[in-house]
Amino acid sequence: MSINATLLIQIIAFVLLIWFVNKVLWGPLSKLMEDRQKKIADGLSAAEKGKHELELAEQRAKEVLKEAKAQAQNVLSQAEKRGSEIVEDAKIKATEEADRIKAAAQAELEQEVSRAREDLRKEVSTLVVSGAEKILNKEVDAAAHNDMLETLVKSI
């Protein structure tokens, strides 16, 4: 095996080719691959972070919705309670008003009955006095007595 100049030139050319590929192509290519790998890792990290934030936001939304439902239920129950109180107050007031009107009507009726009785007593006593005067002024026989009683009954 003899080493001649061609072999030596080929070895030098091969070494220069490797140095050139390493310097010009391999360095930027490996830097480009590292940058790309870093971008992908950052993207995956951001996606994971976004997924976590989405889960937190969904959980907060559920809590807010649950709180809003509880608040709405509370407002509804208070409104129903207040409505029942208003209806009950109205019933009580209506009952009191009806009782007051009924008592006033009863009192007025009793006054009217008392007045009517008093008027009737006065009229009856006037008629009795008038009848007694007629009886005393006349001598009464049975027929005249019956006539006076009938006249008295008709005038009553």
Swiss-Prot record:
UniProt subcellular location: Cell inner membrane
Mode of membrane association: Single-pass membrane protein
CDD domains named among the record's database cross-references: ATP-synt_Fo_b
GO CC annotations on file: plasma membrane; proton-transporting ATP synthase complex
An example molecular function term from Gene Ontology annotations: proton-transporting ATPase activity, rotational mechanism
Transmembrane segments: 1-21
Principal cellular location given in the protein's record: membrane
Keyword terms: ATP synthesis, Cell inner membrane, Cell membrane, CF(0), Hydrogen ion transport, Ion transport, Membrane, Transmembrane, Transmembrane helix, Transport
Function: F(1)F(0) ATP synthase produces ATP from ADP in the presence of a proton or sodium gradient. F-type ATPases consist of two structural domains, F(1) containing the extramembraneous catalytic core and F(0) containing the membrane proton channel, linked together by a central stalk and a peripheral stalk. During catalysis, ATP synthesis in the catalytic domain of F(1) is coupled via a rotary mechanism of the central stalk subunits to proton translocation.
Family affiliation: Belongs to the ATPase B chain family.
Subunit field text: F-type ATPases have 2 components, F(1) - the catalytic core - and F(0) - the membrane proton channel. F(1) has five subunits: alpha(3), beta(3), gamma(1), delta(1), epsilon(1). F(0) has three main subunits: a(1), b(2) and c(10-14). The alpha and beta chains form an alternating ring which encloses part of the gamma chain. F(1) is attached to F(0) by a central stalk formed by the gamma and epsilon chains, while a peripheral stalk is formed by the delta and b chains.
HAMAP family noted in UniProt: ATP_synth_b_bprime (MF_01398)
Protein name, entry field: ATP synthase subunit b
Organism encoding this protein: Hydrogenovibrio crunogenus (strain DSM 25203 / XCL-2) (Thiomicrospira crunogena)
Gene coding for it: atpF
